[in-house]
Design a protein with these regions (language model features):
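Short, histidine-centered active-site or binding-site loop motifs used for metal coordination
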Residues: 1-2, 122
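Phosphate-binding site of ATP-dependent enzymes
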Residues: 2, 7-89, 93-95
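ATP-dependent carboxylate activation and anion-phosphoryl transfer catalytic cores
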Residues: 82-148
């Protein structure tokens, strides 16, 4: 839960290593388990939410032989849109985040499903979004705070 950029992720199978999991819990004090979605090999979508509104998304595709879509793990970003289901999920989450006074977040969707965590401390991908779309969401965020 404190990790970022695809770090501290274990892929467990039916033959998972109990000692490996025990060491992980001992080191980090907790473990979050998420169902593996096979379609991750086709990429995930990082959705950017600013002040409760969906502002855009990028598709992140893992490098060959990897299950991690993170750019820092070798994933590649592509321009993308959101389908109705993805937009609905993202909008609902955005409203909830705004109620909790979280003004900037990134959520990750695979095949239309939220994969578990909401990135509020490290919602990366803005440089790639700007490169692909020309839109500067970082500037939009800071301008939207009205700190002048």
């Amino acid at each position: 839960l404190d990790g970022y950029a695809g770090k501290n992720i274990l892929f467990l199978t039916k033959k998972f290593s109990k000692p490996k999991v025990s060491l992980f819990i001992k080191k980090y004090n907790y473990l979050m388990v998420q169902k593996y979605l096979n379609k991750v090999k086709f990429g995930d979508k990082r959705v950017f939410i600013i002040k409760g509104k969906v502002k855009g998304a990028i598709k992140r595709v893992p490098r060959a032989g990897s299950n991690l879509s993170n750019i820092s793990q070798g994933g590649t970003a592509f321009k993308t849109g959101l389908n109705k289901k993805e937009l609905k999920i993202s909008s609902l989450i955005g409203k909830s985040l705004l109620k909790d006074k979280i003004y900037f977040a990134g959520i990750d969707l695979i095949d239309g499903y939220l994969i578990g965590d909401i990135n509020v401390t490290s919602p990366t991908g803005l440089p790639q979004f700007k490169d692909l779309t020309g839109k500067n969401l970082a500037k939009d965020f800071w301008d939207g705070l009205g700190l002048k």
